[in-house]
Amino acid sequence: MKSMIGMSLLLGLSVMSADASADEALARSKGCLGCHGIEKGIVGPAYKDVAKKYAGQNVADQLAQKVVKGGGGVWGGMAMPPNNVTPEEAKTLVQWVLSLK
């Protein structure tokens, strides 16, 4: 029984890790990581800083709109341009960013 629980936990963690890798690959393929680092900001803020700022807030839909349409004024003078992503991709990216610790 204990081994079944352990295997289930390991399988769940590997699936979560695969999802996170796929989400990071999406961010990379869409050019997001050219301006945003995970740990450190480049032109835009670091994704971990974004996750920390919005922790516990219900802002995923609002942030996804900013990813699609662009926006500024929250992190300094440089506005984020509109991005060539679908609304579904934007939601996936935002959920990934907000999950970072």
Map each language-model feature to its residues.
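Sequence/structural segment immediately N-terminal to covalent heme-attachment motifs in c-type
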Residues: 21-38
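N-terminal signal peptide c-region/cleavage motif recognized by signal peptidases
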Residues: 15-18
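Post-signal/leader-peptide non-cytosolic segments of secretory proteins
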Residues: 53, 57-58, 62-65
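Axial heme c-ligation environment in periplasmic c-type cytochrome domains
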Residues: 34, 42-52, 66-95, 100
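Absolute protein N-terminus
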Residues: 1, 21-24, 101
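Short glycine-/small-residue-rich flexible loop motifs, especially phosphate/cofactor-binding loops
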Residues: 5, 24, 64
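Sec-dependent signal peptide recognition
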Residues: 2-10
